[in-house]
Amino acid sequence: MVVKIGILKCGNIGMSPVVDLCLDERADRNDIDVRVLGSGAKMGPEQVEEVAKKMVEEIKPDFIVYIGPNPAAPGPKKAREILSAGGIPAVIIGDAPGIKDKDAMAEEGLGYVLIKCDPMIGARRQFLDPVEMAMFNADVIRVLAGTGALRVVQNAIDDMVFAVEEGKEIPLPKIVITEQKAVEAMDFANPYAKAKAMAAFVMAEKVADIDVKGCFMTKEMEKYIPIVASAHETIRYAAKLVDEARELEKATDAVSRKPHAGAGKILNKCKLMEKPE
């Protein structure tokens, strides 16, 4: 059978550009069909309501993944309201500010995956232009991938796919991704590689704190510009750390790779020149 997945992208976090791609990395998987609706960079209640209702009422997938910043904000709360009442299993993927609402999401009958290392961007006009935005998100994606956070998200969604295929009740994940959960998913062979990935994760968490200070808590331009700039420098070095971790794994031919088979099964390999099984 073919499982129909609906993905709602409202606003943007680092995981947003790759949440659908990580399910079908070579575009040759024949057991899923993905439909994506979004509201661009905005995530106001009106924009979110429009795309969420269209997903529930018109596309009607087997399950829905909503992804965006701060699940506790007004726009995402509107999405949660619609998805909770929609009769379609749904999971909310968000960043650390959503942790305070995780119990409420569970009470609404929704799953959640909250990524602590997916930080807020330094959204000050005097600093952030399209190039800086793209470079920041590229660094965040590298951290998500290299620490294992991306793999945790992918596994959670794949578990939902497999349940549909097997005719079972869809498991709604209830996951807060910490550095321990992330690195466990990466199956590091070298303990130093694991330590570097953990350090990168914690650095990315700190980036969010710095950007909150620069964007919301500091009013003077001469103070907040260097604050948000320092946050972006921090994520750049976190991305370098995950590169170092992967290079350590490459040096002993021990990089964990888990590609999807054409039928959707998750395969496994570590040696570069071996076939995944």
From Swiss-Prot:
Entry function: Catalyzes the reversible reduction of methenyl-H(4)MPT(+) to methylene-H(4)MPT.
Enzymatic class: oxidoreductase
Pathway info: One-carbon metabolism; methanogenesis from CO(2); 5,10-methylene-5,6,7,8-tetrahydromethanopterin from 5,10-methenyl-5,6,7,8-tetrahydromethanopterin (coenzyme F420 route): step 1/1
Keyword Oxidoreductase: yes
Family to which this protein belongs: Belongs to the MTD family.
Superkingdom of the source species: Archaea
Catalytic activity: 5,10-methylenetetrahydromethanopterin + oxidized coenzyme F420-(gamma-L-Glu)(n) + 2 H(+) = 5,10-methenyl-5,6,7,8-tetrahydromethanopterin + reduced coenzyme F420-(gamma-L-Glu)(n)
EC number: 1.5.98.1
MF term (GO), any: ferredoxin hydrogenase activity
InterPro entries: MTD, MTD_sf
GO biological process, one term: one-carbon metabolic process
Keywords in alphabetical order: Methanogenesis, One-carbon metabolism, Oxidoreductase
Protein name per the record: F420-dependent methylenetetrahydromethanopterin dehydrogenase
